[in-house]
A protein has these predicted regions:
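Extracellular/periplasmic catalytic domains that process cell-envelope and extracellular macromolecules
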Residues: 3, 49-50, 75-77, 125, ...
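Primarily recognizes the serine-hydrolase "nucleophile elbow" in alpha/beta-hydrolase
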Residues: 106, 112-172
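N-terminal cap/lid segment of alpha/beta-hydrolase-fold proteins
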Residues: 2-50
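Short hydrophobic segments within beta-strands
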Residues: 41, 57-58, 133, 167
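Surface-exposed, flexible loop/turn segments at secondary-structure boundaries
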Residues: 17-18, 46, 63, 90, ...
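Serine-hydrolase catalytic machinery in alpha/beta-hydrolase-like enzymes
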Residues: 26-36, 50-121
Length: 172
């Protein structure tokens, strides 16, 4: 579909993580870095002199679908910047339905944490209003990013999501 508002593709570093224990400590450092991306979707009346709240959003196991994009539009229209993570497209995967090893929950959990760190010091962002949102597999990422031990292991000092919105999250 045609887009009539400001967007920005942002690349950043993440990892392909297999095994929840590999999100912590020295095990995390043994995982190779990869480059992934997300798309910033700006409000219609975006003003670069203001700081905006942001929603970091992640899709479910069938990638971004039309109903997800409808929600992203509503968020934008409510004057939020939406950072739509692209964990599948970044890794050349279309779906994990039937094969959850292509892109693991742990990888998307890590992608979301690194998204927070990426946006924390962005001058366009009000870092006291960064929210995590996700559907299914993406909801699992939001759920685990609310867990204090994970925050202490992965987030920048004092960085945290302000709130969490999950549609039918799974579990590990």
């Amino acid at each position: 579909p045609e887009v009539n508002y400001l967007q920005e593709k942002i690349t950043y570093s993440s990892k392909n993580i297999i095994g929840f224990e590999n999100l912590f400590g020295e095990a995390l450092q043994t995982q190779d870095d990869i480059e992934i991306f997300g798309i910033m979707h700006f409000p219609d009346d975006y003003d670069s002199s203001q700081k905006y709240p942001v929603i970091v959003a992640s899709h479910g196991s069938l990638n971004w679908r039309a109903h997800h994009l409808d929600y992203l539009q509503q968020m934008r229209q409510a004057n939020y910047i939406v950072f739509a993570m692209h964990p599948f497209d970044s890794r050349g995967v279309n779906s994990t339905v039937g094969n959850q090893i292509n892109v693991t929950s742990e990888s998307i959990i890590y992608d979301m944490a690194t998204s927070l760190n990426l946006l924390w010091d962005d001058p366009r962002i009000n870092n006291q209003k960064i929210y995590a949102a996700g559907w299914s597999l993406g909801g699992t990422a939001a759920l685990f990013n609310a867990w204090r031990p994970l925050q202490e292991a992965l987030n920048l000092p004092n960085a945290s999501f302000t709130g969490y919105l999950m549609w039918y999250p799974g579990c590990l």
